[in-house]
Amino acid sequence: DALPKEQQLKLLGEIQEDSEWLIRMVENLLSVTRIDGAKVEVVKTPIVLDELIDSVLMKFSKKHPNQKVITQIPDEFVDIPMDSLLIEQVLLNLLENAVFHAKGMTELTLSVSLVGDKAVFEVADNGCGIPDDALQKIFSGSYEKSAAPVDGTRSNMGIGLSVCAAIVKAHGSEITAENRKGGGAVFRFALERGGEDDGQ
């Protein structure tokens, strides 16, 4: 049976919106990951933290409606200069990485804390954790399926995480990963908060 016209128009609108977002994201991503020996810089615009997190959660819930994400963000107003499309993609990649690879996960958390003049982003899970021998090379793109446990957990992470690392590096920061004492893994990066350098 054909969908009602109103629903068809709504779906078409969502498809167009997602397509335009994807095109912009890919264009920005290509500018960050190009290999030409030049220093890569991103165009930063002050972004309200609440709006960024809401956008990430909305996109994530469309693909993973049954996966709850616990959020912990400051109550105060926070703006952060960034390329929001790329930072959204980093957070989405990290959340989806947990869904696909954190075997045994029952809790997924996205948190932001303020430390001095920085906003520290963390994506944490309570799943299987990351093999110790993989932690040092997990962002290099060389962590292939053969390096993962035989049961396939935490496999095929290298390419996506290397892109995350490139995006964060282009923002003047570094992404790290470590295993949690209580089980699972946490991925972390920090961005400068809004101030004198907004928009640069």
Where is each model-derived feature located?
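Short alpha-helical segment of the dimerization/phosphotransfer core of two-component systems
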Residues: E17-L22
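Conserved micro-motifs of the catalytic ATP-binding
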Residues: G37-V42, D79-M82
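A conserved beta-strand-to-alpha-helix junction within the catalytic ATP-binding
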Residues: V43-L57
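Conserved catalytic submotifs in the C-terminal HATPase_c
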Residues: T45-P46, K68-V78
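Short helix-loop "hinge" at the ATP-lid/N-box region of the Bergerat-fold HATPase_c
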Residues: A98-V99
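Short conserved segment of the HATPase_c
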Residues: I130-S142
